[in-house]
């Protein structure tokens, strides 16, 4: 008998050729940074730096399934979902969000992982006609040389990016609202489930530290 594996899928939009999926990759901040609630790159007890995020998976079955499927991934911050919901509640006509990230250790060629994500809405197409599927999500995966910025961050070194895979999915207003709304509600439920214990643990440690300092 196969094990009943726990799936981290939150919401999915699927046609006979395309798939868009949001997945749970949320992580708690260390107790020392309890008020962040979501991990934001703080150093964990094991020495690693974790980031709380929602995974984005796009798949293209146009050329067949199995090894013919094109699959790309990216990550979004938890704050993106309430943000886009608030925009949608204001009779949104256009929306334009783009983000690119480079991360991970370089390979033998000095290249690191790159994700490029674009989420746009245009109610009218270039031909002037109203679009039935106004939302377009594009994810691109590739490799590039990671370069440090003067502020201490990293970015893609100019001229080094190599695209590996790209998938786009067009979505109508109702389906896009549904997957974003369900994800926003999940994030809220996650915060209400795990946040209280994190806050209690942090306040107890803080009280213990204050008591020890007064002795």
Where does each model-flagged region fall?
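N-terminal "first-domain core" detector
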Residues: 1-68
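Short, low-complexity cationic-aromatic patches
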Residues: 45-50, 74-78, 129-130, 168-177
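Beta-strand-rich binding-surface signature
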Residues: 53, 73, 134
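A cross-kingdom feature marking solvent-exposed beta-strand/loop segments within repeated
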Residues: 58-77, 154-169
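Conserved beta-strand elements of beta-rich interaction domains across eukaryotes
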Residues: 61-63, 81, 144
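Acidic, metal/cofactor-coordinating or nucleic-acid-engaging core segments within structured domains
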Residues: 79-112
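Short, solvent-exposed interaction modules
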Residues: 90, 105-164
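Mixed-charge, glycine-accented linear interaction segment located at domain edges/termini
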Residues: 144-215
């Amino acid at each position: 008998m196969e094990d009943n594996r726990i799936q981290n899928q939150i919401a999915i939009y699927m046609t006979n050729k395309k798939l868009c999926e949001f997945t749970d990759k949320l992580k708690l901040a260390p107790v020392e940074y309890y008020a962040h609630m979501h991990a934001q790159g703080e150093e964990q007890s094991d020495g690693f730096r974790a980031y709380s995020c929602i995974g984005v998976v796009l798949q293209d079955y146009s050329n067949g399934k199995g090894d013919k499927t094109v699959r790309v991934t990216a990550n979004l911050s938890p704050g993106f979902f309430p943000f886009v919901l608030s925009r949608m509640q204001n009779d949104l006509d256009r929306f334009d969000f783009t983000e690119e990230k480079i991360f991970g250790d370089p390979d033998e060629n000095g290249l690191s992982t790159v994700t490029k994500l674009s989420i746009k809405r245009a109610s009218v197409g270039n031909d002037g006609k109203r679009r039935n599927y106004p939302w377009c999500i594009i994810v691109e995966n590739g490799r590039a040389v990671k370069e440090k910025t003067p502020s201490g961050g990293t970015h893609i070194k100019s001229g080094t990016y190599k695209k590996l895979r790209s998938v786009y999915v067009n979505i109508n207003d109702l389906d896009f609202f549904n997957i974003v709304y369900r994800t926003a509600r999940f994030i809220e439920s996650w915060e209400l489930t795990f946040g209280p214990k994190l806050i209690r643990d942090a306040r107890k440690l803080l009280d213990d530290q204050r008591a020890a300092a007064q002795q």
